[in-house]
Amino acid sequence: MEKQAVITATDLCIGYRTHKGEKKVHEHLSFGLYPGELTSLLGANGAGKSTLLRTLSASQPSLAGDLQLLGKPLQQYSEKERSRTIGVVLTDKTQAGGLTVYELVALGRQPHTGFFGRLHPKDHLIIKEALDAVGIAHKAESYTAELSDGERQKVMIAKALVQECPLIILDEPTAFLDVVSRIEIMTLLHQLAVEQNKAILLSTHDIEQALVLSDKLWL
């Protein structure tokens, strides 16, 4: 059976709208992201990687073209619907150093429980499974400020996992990491894509690991 894309773009144009008009970064882009696949986006700084990721996560609108998420135009999704469909992990280091690992990951359940939502047994099970999946369960009660950069990245991936989204987008997830941690994170993401049947898209400068561990490369 042919796999159905989680998100598809047809003749997509990305860029910015300013008071001087439109500034196109890339145009005529057509592609799909599929469940069970890790796709790596490669390119130099300023090549438009972050612009594409922001467009796909609905953080900024496209300039033209069609963008479909699970067969529905992306712009028709409410913020709550998007948060249940697209998980986003940014490069910026988390400022939630006063939270434990468990507490931070639990915030990823907000799309299902609401901002002040109470966690039910099912939520706690999902959180535990995510911590186990990324190999950070033993740090559940540690404060995030005490973690290494690689451990913090695992926590943010776990936070995205508990959103139960079919699509996860990561902006430079291996930035600031040493070689061993970069390999570990890339291996983990490929494993999660396959085992949890998720479409995962990441931007990276790590060409060697992307070549080895990605199912698809976008240049």
Locations of the language-model features?
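Conserved ABC transporter NBD signature motif
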Residues: G65-P73, R82
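The feature captures the beta-strand-to-loop junction immediately N-terminal to the Walker
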Residues: L42-A44
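Conserved ABC ATPase signature
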Residues: Y143-L147
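Conserved ABC ATPase "signature" region
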Residues: A106, P121-K139, E164
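Conserved structural motif at the start of ABC-family nucleotide-binding domains
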Residues: I7, H26-H28
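Helix-to-loop junction immediately C-terminal to a conserved catalytic motif
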Residues: S57
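Catalytic Walker B motif of ABC-type/P-loop ATPase nucleotide-binding domains
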Residues: I168-D171
